[in-house]
Amino acid sequence: MTGVPGSSITLDDLPLRDDLRGKSPYGAPQLSVPVRLNTNENPHPPTRALIDDVAQSVREVAGELHRYPDRDAVALRTDLAAYLSAQTGTAVGVENVWAANGSNEILQQLLQAFGGPGRSALGFVPSYSMHPIISDGTQTRWLVANRGDDFGLDAAVAATAIKEHTPDVVFVTSPNNPSGQSVSLDDLRLLLDALCLQDGGVMIVDEAYGEFSSQPSAIGLIESYPGKLVVTRTMSKAFAFAGGRVGYLVAAPAVIDAMLLVRLPYHLSSVTQAAARAALRHADDTLGSVATLIAERERVSQALTGMGFRVIPSDANFILFGEFADAPATWQRYLDEGVLIRDVGIPGYLRTTIGLAEENDALLAASARIGAP
């Protein structure tokens, strides 16, 4: 008898699905270091007013914790619709919005509805690492088309890939993670027009970093492509609500009807809904940090370029830079300097989040000591 019941067996001993054997789970290191720049969070903490509002809002719902929450999160979705209408300039209503526990749950629900066994999803790589993981988890066949040498998306090449593969789901990340480039509305139209040539097929435009982007939101295209386009977003990045775990999508009302078929009952807790609504009431204050982060991004980009690094131009709150002979070894050197950044698996490149000015200074000081490749 060991101290941990059941520790005599391993994952290999379980009747796991064959298609999951050999897979690796998602994981960004969570280490205690002086400077953490690896998960693209907004480094500015919530204001005292926001903290007080969240605390009061949670206190108000605490008396009803013995009851299930609003299973459709109507009040939260209404607030999100109002925020999106103001932020993007495209009027949307509660009927256009769906919310869940982070945008990853949104993506999972979309793959449950539109992917699954016998269906496929196409991604343009390198891009967000959870897209293939969620595809695998929903038994959706994962297909890839490569981005260019600068990691940008060539719309003509991407449209050709859509026509060739006729996927059931297409992922387009804008701004792209980990490279940072946005996709223009004209290029998105080209991809959507290619998708319209086939029966079925849905394009998911992942706008997790949309508040940082210089390009208009794809939400403005939903009216023209109601059966083809879904836009996903999150409160974890610019909104500085990563600990709150709220993501959402914007689409034609019929897509929300599809989500109702696959969501788990009462999936968003009363506490989550109350806290998120409080955060939305302070959107102007929170998003005031976006301009500061963009200015810091440009400062860090210029400094790294001046040191001799190759910096991929970014439209988000992070920078992909290189070119290193051994990216994993260089990542360790940064960690030894007390700076945690991200090895995203692209040979020769590392990604850093834009942090507070003093955190960025620490990154630049470490970069100067490490030296450009």
Swiss-Prot record:
Keywords attached to this entry: Amino-acid biosynthesis, Aminotransferase, Histidine biosynthesis, Pyridoxal phosphate, Transferase
Cofactor(s) annotated in UniProt: pyridoxal 5'-phosphate
CDD domains listed in its UniProt record: AAT_like
Pathway field: Amino-acid biosynthesis; L-histidine biosynthesis; L-histidine from 5-phospho-alpha-D-ribose 1-diphosphate: step 7/9
Reactions performed catalytically: L-histidinol phosphate + 2-oxoglutarate = 3-(imidazol-4-yl)-2-oxopropyl phosphate + L-glutamate
Keyword GTP-binding recorded: no
Residues covered by region (Disordered): 1-45
Example GO BP: L-histidine biosynthetic process
InterPro entries, per the entry: Aminotrans_II_pyridoxalP_BS, Aminotransferase_I/II_large, HisP_aminotrans, PyrdxlP-dep_Trfase, PyrdxlP-dep_Trfase_major, PyrdxlP-dep_Trfase_small
Biased composition (Polar residues): 1-10
Pfam families linked to this entry: Aminotran_1_2
Sequence positions bearing N6-(pyridoxal phosphate)lysine: 237
Top EC category: transferase
MF annotations from Gene Ontology: histidinol-phosphate transaminase activity; pyridoxal phosphate binding
PANTHER family documented for this protein: HISTIDINOL-PHOSPHATE AMINOTRANSFERASE, HISTIDINOL-PHOSPHATE AMINOTRANSFERASE-RELATED
NCBIfam families (alphabetical): hisC (TIGR01141), PRK03317.1 (NF002877)
Oligomeric form and interacting partners: Homodimer.
HAMAP family listed in its UniProt record: HisC_aminotrans_2
Similarity comment text for this entry: Belongs to the class-II pyridoxal-phosphate-dependent aminotransferase family. Histidinol-phosphate aminotransferase subfamily.
Name of the protein this chain belongs to: Histidinol-phosphate aminotransferase
Originating gene: hisC
